């Protein structure tokens, strides 16, 4: 539908990531592909079944206390998806590309936003 699911973190142990916006996802477990990990994370954390589609971009970012390599993919909800549950985030919203510019993004996610714009 041309919109992107954006999730707002709650308070984290690092001030620079607290209450920032991010795209949903998570860590890859041993034996998983990045696509399998993304589908699993969305199902576990949000009860949201998705089909993982094309790769958008891979971003490497160095925070003061850790580094992250993040690969973003376009996803579409599976037919049985009836919305999602927000379990680990303070807020969520669906945003058009123009609306993405208005959010206070986690630094690592800025590269993903730029690839969309």
Regions found by a protein language model. Give the residues of each.
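N-terminal strand-loop-strand
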Residues: 1-21
């Amino acid at each position: 539908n041309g919109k992107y699911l954006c999730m707002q973190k709650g308070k984290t142990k690092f001030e620079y990531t607290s209450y920032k916006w991010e795209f949903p996802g998570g860590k890859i477990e041993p034996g998983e592909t990045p696509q399998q990990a993304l589908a699993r994370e969305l199902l576990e954390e949000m009860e949201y079944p998705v089909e993982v589609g094309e790769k958008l971009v891979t971003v490497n970012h160095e925070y003061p206390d850790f580094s992250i390599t993040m690969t973003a993919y376009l996803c579409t909800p599976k037919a049985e998806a009836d919305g999602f549950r927000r379990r680990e985030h303070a807020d969520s919203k669906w945003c058009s590309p123009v609306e993405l510019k208005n959010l206070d993004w986690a630094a690592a996610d800025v590269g993903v936003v730029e690839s969309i714009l």
